């Protein structure tokens, strides 16, 4: 099974489970969790089921295309099930079977690993899922996003699709993964890994990045104050990525790092609060249980 087929199999499987198949979000981010289809939709009472591929950028992880397992740009396959179904682990194992991995024939372990994103003010109870000694998935029950409680709790499944592809194809290097017949992962991404590693570690202009961070922070605040949730969140993502670039350039001290994280977290909380207010004003249109919807609206009016 090539890399492209793997993604299509996951799309098909989760689509059959009732998930919306969304497309990647068009702003740089460090993880699929940061896509608004997860970060924002995990908030509030409305149900939500979504699956998508998310290109993820982590500038400090670049290795100039020389490390077979470490990349500054890679893919995650993200699934959100809200509220979390009782059979979520069974669904995950069924998805592995659909990829040709029979759980009964392998050593599959859940290793406790609670997840936290300080910049997003988000955390959850979770586990790494290991396949024959290699981590392939992160499973999380969201507890908070943007500092607000997630009620109902969402289940997040984040597949490391390069690792799964390496396992299925019996490859030792991510760059040897067959994307499609005759085209490898290296053909698609290797030169970009080299170029971005040079940029992230050597060429990025620290002064310009610092100025851009300040500008994006100001714009996030200004736009959020106008209750424009999605545009404001875009600037939160930009701030997060700019912080990661500055970190890769070695331009942030330990003290400054804490301050930068706090600044991004405050922005994320501000946008999360505006999102919750926006959905309330819209009377929770995705909440199909009319009785529950009216009850929530009445309770919030009392508060």
From Swiss-Prot:
Q: Give a GO molecular function annotation for the protein.
A: catalytic activity, acting on a protein
Q: What is its EC number?
A: 6.1.1.14
Q: Which reaction does it catalyse?
A: tRNA(Gly) + glycine + ATP = glycyl-tRNA(Gly) + AMP + diphosphate
What are the annotated GO cellular component locations? cytosol
Signal sequence, start to end: none
- Which Pfam families does the UniProt record give? tRNA-synt_2e
Q: Look up keyword Protein biosynthesis and say if it applies.
A: yes
Q: What is its main location?
A: cytoplasm
Places the protein is found: Cytoplasm
Q: Give the keywords, sorted.
A: Aminoacyl-tRNA synthetase, ATP-binding, Cytoplasm, Ligase, Nucleotide-binding, Protein biosynthesis
Q: Which InterPro entries match?
A: aa-tRNA-synth_II/BPL/LPL (IPR045864), Gly-tRNA-synth_heterodimer (IPR006194), Gly-tRNA_ligase_asu (IPR002310)
Q: Name one GO biological process term.
A: glycyl-tRNA aminoacylation
Reply yes or no: does the keyword Ion transport apply.
Answer: no
What does the subunit section of this Swiss-Prot or TrEMBL entry state?
A: Tetramer of two alpha and two beta subunits.
Family under the similarity heading: Belongs to the class-II aminoacyl-tRNA synthetase family.
Official protein name in the record: Glycine--tRNA ligase alpha subunit
The root-end lineage is: Bacteria, Bacillati, Bacillota, Clostridia, Eubacteriales
């Amino acid at each position: 099974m090539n890399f492209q087929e793997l993604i299509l199999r996951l799309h098909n499987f989760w689509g059959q489970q009732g998930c919306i198949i969304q497309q990647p979000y068009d702003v740089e981010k460090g993880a699929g969790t940061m896509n608004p289809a997860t970060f924002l939709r995990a908030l509030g009472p409305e149900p939500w089921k979504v699956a998508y591929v998310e290109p993820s950028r982590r500038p400090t992880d670049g290795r100039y295309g020389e490390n077979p397992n470490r990349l500054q740009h890679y893919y995650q396959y993200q699934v959100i099930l809200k509220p979390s179904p009782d059979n979520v682990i069974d669904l995950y194992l069924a998805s592995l079977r659909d990829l040709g991995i029979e759980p009964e024939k392998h050593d599959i372990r859940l290793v406790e690993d609670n997840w936290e994103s300080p910049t997003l003010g988000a955390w959850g109870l979770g586990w790494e899922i290991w396949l024959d000694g290699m981590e392939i998935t992160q499973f999380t029950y969201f507890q908070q996003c943007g500092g607000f409680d997630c009620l109902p709790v969402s289940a997040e499944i984040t597949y490391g699709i390069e690792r799964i592809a390496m396992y299925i194809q019996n490859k030792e290097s991510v760059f040897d993964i067959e994307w499609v017949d005759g085209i490898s992962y290296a053909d698609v991404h290797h030169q970009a890994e080299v170029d971005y590693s040079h940029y992230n570690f050597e060429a990025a202009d620290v002064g310009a990045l610092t100025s851009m961070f300040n500008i994006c922070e100001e714009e996030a605040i200004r736009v959020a104050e106008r209750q424009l949730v999605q545009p404001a969140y875009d600037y939160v993502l930009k701030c997060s990525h700019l912080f990661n670039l500055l970190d890769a350039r070695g331009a942030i001290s330990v003290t400054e790092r804490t301050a930068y994280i706090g600044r991004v977290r405050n922005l994320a909380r501000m946008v999360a609060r505006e999102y919750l207010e926006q959905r309330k004003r819209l009377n929770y249109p995705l909440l199909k249980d009319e009785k529950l919807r009216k009850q929530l609206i009445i309770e919030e009016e009392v508060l």
